[in-house]
């Protein structure tokens, strides 16, 4: 087994170069992700559709591109939101926008900027999303719950992510394959 590693042990400078190149690729991908996050004002500027609740508009596995710089959301717009206490992004259409009223405990507050209140529903669902919201939550808050509005998509390419989450052993195989390719790469 160690004999197969002998070419890498013989030239440590080449091995170090390959490890640094691999680190450069990973850090570049991270920087691109963070730059997209800043540009779009969204913690997750790219998400994958995980269910069929938005069919026929979006299929399971579609890759969505988000934008969160618009101050307002309109009825009919497709948004991605997180429910408080859950980490799974939900992609649904805005069905109703409530009037902007800055409130705290039911009383108007002066000097507090109002945030839109939204009601959403999946195109393929029979009822609105109030059952999906956190207990006691009747609507989404534009500022705190929304990750962004959908501005574009690529069909089916997100299935890789779905496969990796549904079959954890694939992650190990993929990482092992990538590591092997880095080690076998000759410059």
From Swiss-Prot:
GO MF annotation terms: serine-type endopeptidase activity
GO annotation (BP), single: signal peptide processing
Ranges where the record places region C-terminal short (CTS) helix: 173-184
Assigned keywords, A-Z: Endoplasmic reticulum, Glycoprotein, Hydrolase, Membrane, Protease, Signal-anchor, Transmembrane, Transmembrane helix
Residue intervals annotated with topology Cytoplasmic: 1-18
Top-level taxon of the source organism: Eukaryota
Record topological domains on the Lumenal side: 40-187
Membrane topology category: Single-pass type II membrane protein
Locations listed in the record: Endoplasmic reticulum membrane
Membrane spanning residue stretches: 19-39
E.C. number: 3.4.21.89
Keyword Glycoprotein: yes
Assembly description: Component of the signal peptidase complex (SPC) composed of a catalytic subunit SEC11 and three accessory subunits SPC1, SPC2 and SPC3. The complex induces a local thinning of the ER membrane which is used to measure the length of the signal peptide (SP) h-region of protein substrates. This ensures the selectivity of the complex towards h-regions shorter than 18-20 amino acids. SPC associates with the translocon complex.
Primary gene name: SEC11
Glycan-modified residues: 125
Role: Catalytic component of the signal peptidase complex (SPC) which catalyzes the cleavage of N-terminal signal sequences from nascent proteins as they are translocated into the lumen of the endoplasmic reticulum. Specifically cleaves N-terminal signal peptides that contain a hydrophobic alpha-helix (h-region) shorter than 18-20 amino acids.
NCBIfam families, alphabetized: sigpep_I_arch (TIGR02228)
Name this polypeptide is given: Signal peptidase complex catalytic subunit SEC11
Swiss-Prot/TrEMBL domain comment: The C-terminal short (CTS) helix is essential for catalytic activity. It may be accommodated as a transmembrane helix in the thinned membrane environment of the complex, similarly to the signal peptide in the complex substrates.
């Amino acid at each position: 087994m160690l004999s197969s590693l002998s070419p890498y042990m013989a030239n440590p400078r080449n091995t170090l170069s390959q490890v640094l190149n691999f680190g450069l690729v990973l850090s570049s991908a991270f920087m691109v992700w963070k730059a997209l996050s800043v540009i779009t004002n969204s913690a997750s500027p790219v998400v994958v559709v995980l269910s069929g609740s938005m069919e026929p508009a979006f299929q399971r596995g579609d890759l969505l591109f988000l934008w969160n710089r618009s101050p307002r959301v309109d009825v009919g717009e497709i948004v991605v939101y997180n429910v408080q206490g859950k980490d799974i992004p939900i992609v649904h259409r805005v069905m109703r926008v409530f009037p902007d009223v800055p409130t705290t405990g039911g009383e108007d507050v002066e000097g507090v900027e109002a945030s839109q209140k939204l009601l959403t529903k999946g195109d393929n669902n029979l009822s609105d999303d109030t059952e999906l919201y956190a207990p006691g939550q009747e609507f989404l808050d534009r500022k705190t719950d929304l990750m962004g509005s959908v501005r574009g998509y690529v069909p089916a390419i997100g299935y890789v992510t779905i496969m990796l989450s549904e079959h954890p052993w694939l992650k190990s195989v993929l990482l092992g394959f990538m590591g092997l390719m880095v080690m076998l790469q000759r410059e």
